[in-house]
Each structure stands twice: as structure tokens, then as C-alpha cells.
Amino acid sequence: LGRKVTLGQEVALVDASILPDDLLLAMPGEHNRLNAALAYRALAALNLDDEEIFEAMASFPGVEGRLQFIGEVNGVRIYNDNNSTTPQATIAGLEALAVDGERKIVLIAGGAYKNVDPTMMIDVIDRATKYVALLAGTGTDLIAEELDADVFDSLTAAVESALARAEAGDTLLFSPGFASFGMFRNEYDRNDQFVKIITTYAAE
């Protein structure tokens, strides 16, 4: 896995192997390590010090709503992947957090259809999750029957059910895979509501 990046007249083939094995990033997943490798190669071409680059990468907290770790509730790690509004993005989130051979992810997904076939998510969801809470919507209608999932008319109810099913050591992933139309004003409203709900639980 690699990408070409052009630096002036130089074209370099970059993959994640150029990063130190012990470099821990806040955002999990091989795709995020590849992004970091691209950033490293560009910064190194500007003659910046490797140690400073890697220190900055290790301290980078990530981007809000993109596999963002926002805390723990009763030993359950919570990731906010609200900006994943396509099936492909939700698949990437699941694969980033999945542990081989274990189904330790509790997933909250669902929403409004946006002209992308959502059925591509079904196999990955089945392999990686122990419980799925879906937000009602036109996209959810296309996958609900294929999944052993509960459908909810509010995000609050979905989070409540997901946390009730999760156990210490599990991961709760909020990765909608669909648009926010209908239940929310926009995706920013959806993001803010999720963070507010989790903050309330974490404070208990």
C-alpha cells in the first residue's frame, strides 16, 4: 500500500513502513499511518528534523469527528467517527479498530441514503461487531433487515442501548455511514449531540 507524492520535480513512492514501528498516533488505522507517512515525507523534504516531526505526530490529537477518541465510559473506549458519511468510510473505521477474531465493537450507524450502495458494509459489520444500533433513516432501511440490529428514532436512545450492551474492554464506535438529513440539522449538529451525550455519561 502506497501513494506517489510529488515534491517539486521529485516523485517518491510512500508507504507507512517509513514510519518508526513505535510511533503511536492518536487516530488508529493503517490509512491514518499512510497519511502520516505522506506528511513525514513532505516535511523531511523541507529538511525538518526527524525527531521533531515524529514528536509532533505523536502529540497530534487528531481531527474532530474522524476516529476521534473522546474518552471512556465504564471501561468502554468511545470513538467519534461522525464525519464518516459513506459506507466506505465506516468500513475503514471498523477495520482500524477491529481486533482479529474478536467482535468487541459496539457500532452506532445509520441515517439518510446518499446514492452509495450501503450493503458493502454488511459483511464487515457482521465480522467486527457484537451489537449494532442504527439511527432511523432511508439508508438504514436498506440494511436493517440484513443485520441483527436495533433501530432507534433518536441518538440518545441509540447511545443508551449501545452502552448497555458494551462491556469493559469493548469499543463503542459512532460511525454513521450515511448522511444526517432528517434526524439532525446537519452533520455538525449530529457530531455535537453525540459528544454532548457521551460527556453526560462520562460525568456520572
Predicted regions and their residues:
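Short beta-strands and strand-loop turn motifs
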Residues: 173-177
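Acidic, Mg2+-coordinating active-site environments of NTP-dependent enzymes
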Residues: 1-78, 140, 144-145
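Short, flexible loop segments at boundaries between secondary-structure elements
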Residues: 195-204
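Short amphipathic alpha-helix with an adjacent loop that forms part of the alpha/beta core around
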Residues: 122-123, 161-165
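Active-site beta-alpha connecting loops in nucleotide-dependent enzymes
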Residues: 63, 82-151, 155, 179-180, ...
